[in-house]
Amino acid sequence: MFLKNPSILILDEATSGLDPIVRDEVINLFNEFTRDENHSILISSHIISDLEKICDYIAFLHQGELLLCEEKDLLLSRYGLLQCSQEQLLQLNPAAIKAKRISAYGAEALVLRDQIPPTLTVNPVSLEELFIFLIKERA
């Protein structure tokens, strides 16, 4: 059943399987729809680049657990990627480190930006990197 003038769209994998041109057109339609403050879209998708273009808020579920639920821009400003030595990583407050990868060449960590000393450079994180770090940390 379709409503004539819906105020909310509930979509599951709405852009999955579409070629890039059509996907871009569909995303533009979604953005036009949400320009009206009374319109919202609840979307589930594995295509994270689409979520970055469409969503204002992100809820990230993994194996039935809600890992994140926050405004997208806040998430991206709150978290960052730190590349450093293993020794530098050990000197950080453990609460600042949300996930990490250790290799023979050093460490890369998903961190809370505001808890990292200004002497260390924290790089921006994408939603995809954020999700991958969080999932792999739980594996």
Walk through the language-model features, giving the residues of each.
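Short loop immediately C-terminal to the Walker-B catalytic DE motif
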Residues: 15-16, 48
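Catalytic Walker B motif of ABC-type/P-loop ATPase nucleotide-binding domains
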Residues: 9-13
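Helix N-cap at the start of a conserved alpha-helix in ABC-type nucleotide-binding domains
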Residues: 20-22
